[in-house]
Amino acid sequence: MRIRFAMLGVLLGGLFSIAPAQDRPPIRDNSFLVEEAYNQEPRVVQHISVLALTRRSSDWEYGFTQEWPLGSQRHQLSVTIPILNAADATGVGDIAVNYRYQLAFNDATGNALAPRFSVILPTGDADRGRGTSSLGLQVNLPASLGVHRSLVTHWNVGGTWTASARAPGGGRVATRDIAAAASAIWLLTRQLNLMLEAAWAREEIAIAADTRVAEESAWLSPGLRAAIDFSSGLQIVPGLAFPIGIGPSDGERRVLFYLSFEHGF
């Protein structure tokens, strides 16, 4: 509980940032469950940490992502490293190497489109539920739409194909996952945003040789984020959200902490 109040204090503190906010653009590329369609600006790198805690459980998930522009905003390379804890066992999951192409971008309206292609490396332990022990390919289509100068929406649809997922007891099978997500971001100020995100996924899990089962999940997540800008160009964005399980995930609750550092290089 103390951690939550401390994070809330930092978020509200974003209203009184160190650097003047008038010449700063509004917060854009800092979503939690939904992928926005804004690539990194030239010579600006972003380091993103997301920690999700499961209520009334010791399980947690942490993800670290680093994003770099490749020469310009049109091309972006990133790496996502997940660390998972379940049943008091902690380890690295399957690492994703991502390329994203800025197909369309309008700075004035906030409208953007940026398809992403990812290679998922078999770095996790399948026997402990932290990976598939197989190479995977993933595609996602993030679209961002500025509805109003104070309201931006983000939309995602994508899928993952795993060539030969390994079941915990042995045996392999190809799996296919699909996912969709959407969000509405209210720009309360340039440095403080209220968020409502929704995410749904259908994942196939290998349980034996040539045998898989499908599991669905659905979440509705209210949250907020704030920007703390420094005269050096460094921007720190802390965020807090409370994902609520709906439909197939009814009854599940999580607390999500977000922290981003963005700076030039």
Describe these PLM feature segments.
Residues 1-28:
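Cleavable N-terminal export/targeting peptides
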Residues 21-265:
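Transmembrane beta-barrel domains of Gram-negative outer membranes and organellar outer membranes
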